[in-house]
Regions:
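Post-HExxH zinc-binding segment in Zn-dependent metallohydrolases
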Residues: 323, 491-544, 621, 628, ...
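Contiguous, non-catalytic segments that form substrate-binding/exosite surfaces or channel walls
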Residues: 285-459
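Active-site recognition of the HExxH zinc-binding catalytic motif
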Residues: 462-493, 514-515
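Short, glycine/acidic-rich hinge or "gate" loops at secondary-structure transitions
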Residues: 270-276, 430-436, 495-509, 527-534, ...
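Alpha-helix capping and helix-loop boundary segments enriched in small/acidic/polar residues
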Residues: 409, 449-450, 466-478, 500-509, ...
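C-terminal, non-catalytic "cap/extension" segments appended to globular domains
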Residues: 4-291, 322-395, 568-685
């Protein structure tokens, strides 16, 4: 499907005169109010207008419309209760089984199960639920919901939702399922673009032993294969503990990242252990050492021809696929609108203001000065990923890898230890076993992810990367994060009062709760005992991390706005625009601290390419996570508070946070704690 093939959706007036429909609605309203009483007048009027908003000529003529309304309006509370319960139960089954099929179809692509064949990619890109919304409008189940339950605006949910009952919130979420009427072919096109971008990102590995410097030295060990951007970034972090070669490694990784972002990286070095590459000069030669069992392709020319803007061509494909849904979403006519007003339920302007509040805080140069004093040198751009505030930085990667590989040689070994890990996090033994019994652990092809369930009878899946030598620190750190997702997924589905309220307000909350777990990774290994200084250091780490990812999010937001402003852009034009946006963002928020201009490093995030404007969830998640962690500290533990919060369900972000912590979402808690942490830690290295 091309963009030109998408036209504005037809309305009922295209085949039925507006006068006819207006007259029919007037008569129906009077008839139903007379039948069910004045107490139903508001519901009748609202329901009729909601149905009319989506009714199309193919749905039937005036007589069909009248017959449908008379047959399906629930005019008393008992009938409405039966309808609500039935839809809730059956939609859980539908969602659950569709999700189960999708998971199975994606397994070869998502899991470390050998080569991905062309047909595997087709299976992975197929969305069995793509036609469901279309079907529900065709069979008029969607219209039944719209006739009986309220569609609401974000403003109404924010301002009126404070006084709603849990049942009212569940009804609101039920109606929201049918707030758009997007054709199945559009949903399929979006799923296909998402699958293609996932494949591109999941295969973007760099063989680190084959990076050489000007002297031909290899700084990284054999067989090290790092996925961009996650593993490259994390290797920068662990290198702070390497007093001999850490700085050289970090500078080299920065060069690699910049080559990827600018697309000057030689195509031949991507996922290829058979060539050596000097990122500084961009020289490529046949490998002079071998650290893989794979065989080099015959007759492959070893040249440094750059990747042909594939990174930005892939991003453009996701934009053009997402844009196909725009005409069918009149209240949120761009992906940007849908992400903020529907998915996050926090206005974009408010998100931007919160991020700006952190990035321009006078605390930033104070923390930067402290980092410089600890490093004993001026900051360099890659120090945006400084992690020396974390207690674990005193351990080398090799020490952590050895400890973890021995403890978790397989995915099954990690699964068996989940109850113990949850008990260490403060969950009562019974609840730890309850959650662990509902988690399946799979070896991931990529960096790892958590796949929830959509019905209570299904288990959630934790996907983590397991090397042949066993789990390493990077894999463990990600696994703990994904385990946080999994526990939230279990509690917010199995223990919430209405399954229609399954989940949390938005994915920033999902990330926030996962960060709570991830921040305890070293404690789970028995390597850190929290005290006042450690807590202050963790606060500084959270603040610096939010400073970093906040800029990344602003780049992601600006790039999507640019694509909407330039719908006919080429990959090369998008590349140049992204680089300029990255430079402008760096120059505004980071040059005053780092003293260097026009740095493009923050555009390295793979999420920018395959995640459809997901990145703002991370800094919002950091702010939310900090508020949540502060509450857990006040309460004296993670487990019970985590469970209380996770079962609040999918209400608006501020309402959820008010119930969880007593205050709305904001940056103030992090900024206040950072100020106190600076006083606690001082300027001592």
């Amino acid at each position: 499907m091309t963009q030109s093939s998408v036209n504005a959706p037809p309305s009922a007036s295209d085949g039925i005169s507006a006068a006819q429909m207006k007259d029919a609605m007037r008569k129906l309203q009077a008839e139903l109010v007379a039948k069910y009483g004045d107490g139903q007048a508001v519901r009748v009027r609202r329901g009729l207008h909601q149905v009319m908003e989506f009714w199309r000529p193919e749905d039937g003529d005036v007589a069909s419309f009248q017959s449908f309304v008379r047959t399906n309006f629930a005019g008393d509370q008992a009938s409405l209760d039966v309808m609500f319960d039935r839809f809730q139960r059956l939609l859980e089954q539908l969602d659950g089984h569709m999700h189960e099929i999708s998971r199975e179809f994606r397994n070869q692509q998502d899991l470390d199960r050998g080569p991905v064949r062309p047909y595997d990619e087709v299976f992975g890109g197929y969305d069995p639920s793509a036609h469901v919304l279309d079907d529900f409008f065709q069979n008029k189940l969607a219209f039944t919901v719209l006739l009986n339950f309220p569609l609401t605006t974000l403003e109404e949910r924010i301002n009126l939702g404070l006084k709603w009952t849990r049942r009212q919130w569940a009804e609101t979420r039920l109606a929201q399922r049918f707030a758009k009427r997007v054709p199945a072919e559009v949903n399929l096109a979006i799923a296909q673009a998402a699958s293609e971008s996932d494949i591109y990102i999941a295969g973007y590995n760099i063989w680190m032993h084959h990076l050489v410097d000007e002297q031909g030295q290899r700084l990284f060990p054999p067989k090290m294969r790092l996925l961009s951007h996650w593993n490259l970034r994390d290797e920068i972090k662990v290198a702070y503990a390497d007093t001999q070669n850490g700085l050289a490694k970090q500078r080299m990784i920065q060069q690699v990242m910049e080559r990827i972002v600018t697309q000057s990286i030689p195509q031949v070095v991507i996922e290829n252990p058979h060539v050596d590459w000097n990122p500084a000069t961009n020289e490529v030669k046949p490998a002079t050492v071998h650290d893989t069992d794979t065989t080099a392709l015959v007759n492959t020319r070893v040249i440094n021809a750059p990747e042909p803007d594939t990174r930005y061509a892939t991003l453009l494909k996701t934009y053009r696929a997402a844009r196909l849904a725009d005409p069918y979403s009149p209240t949120a006519p761009t992906l940007v609108d849908r992400r903020f007003n529907e998915d996050r339920e926090i206005p974009e302007e408010r998100v931007q203001a919160m991020l700006d509040q952190v990035l321009t805080s006078p605390l930033v140069p104070q923390v930067a000065k402290l980092i410089e004093s600890r490093l004993g040198r001026p900051l360099e751009p890659f120090d945006i990923w400084y992690n020396g505030f974390r207690p674990g930085s005193k351990y080398t990667e090799a020490e952590l890898d050895g400890l973890i590989a021995k403890k978790y040689p397989t995915a099954e070994a990690y699964r068996q230890d989940i109850p113990n890990l949850l008990i260490k996090l403060g969950f009562p033994t019974e609840r730890a076993q309850y959650a662990a019994a509902r988690i399946t652990v799979d070896p991931a092809r990529g960096s790892g992810h958590a796949m929830g369930a959509e019905m209570r009878s299904e288990k959630v899946h934790l996907r983590t990367r397991i090397e042949k030598s066993g789990m390493n620190y990077k894999g463990f750190n990600i696994a703990v994060h994904e385990m946080g997702h999994n526990v939230e997924q279990i509690l917010s589905l199995n223990d919430v009062d209405y399954t229609l309220l399954q989940g949390v307000p938005n994915t920033a909350f999902t990330e926030a709760l996962a960060f709570v777990f991830q921040g305890q990774d070293l404690m789970l290994l028995g390597l850190a005992a929290p005290d006042a200084k450690i807590q202050s250091m963790k606060t500084l780490n959270d603040f610096w991390g939010t400073y970093e990812i906040g800029g990344v999010a602003l780049i992601d937001m600006a790039v999507w706005h640019w694509m909407y402003d330039h719908p006919q852009a080429t990959p090369a034009e998008l590349r140049d625009a992204t680089l300029q946006i990255a430079k402008d963002t760096w120059n505004r928020y980071y040059t005053p601290v780092f003293g260097r201009k026009d740095v493009v490093l923050l555009a390295i995030y793979s999420h920018m390419i395959d995640s459809f404007l997901y990145l703002p969830d991370y800094p919002i998640g950091h702010l939310i996570a900090f508020q949540i962690e502060e509450q857990m500290r006040k309460a004296g533990g993670i487990g019970p508070e985590f469970e209380r919060m996770a079962t609040l369900g999918r209400v608006t972000p501020d309402l959820w946070m008010e119930h969880a912590t007593g205050k709305p979402v904001g940056a103030e808690a992090l900024l206040s704690a950072t100020e106190n942490a600076l006083k606690q830690v001082g300027s001592q290295p």
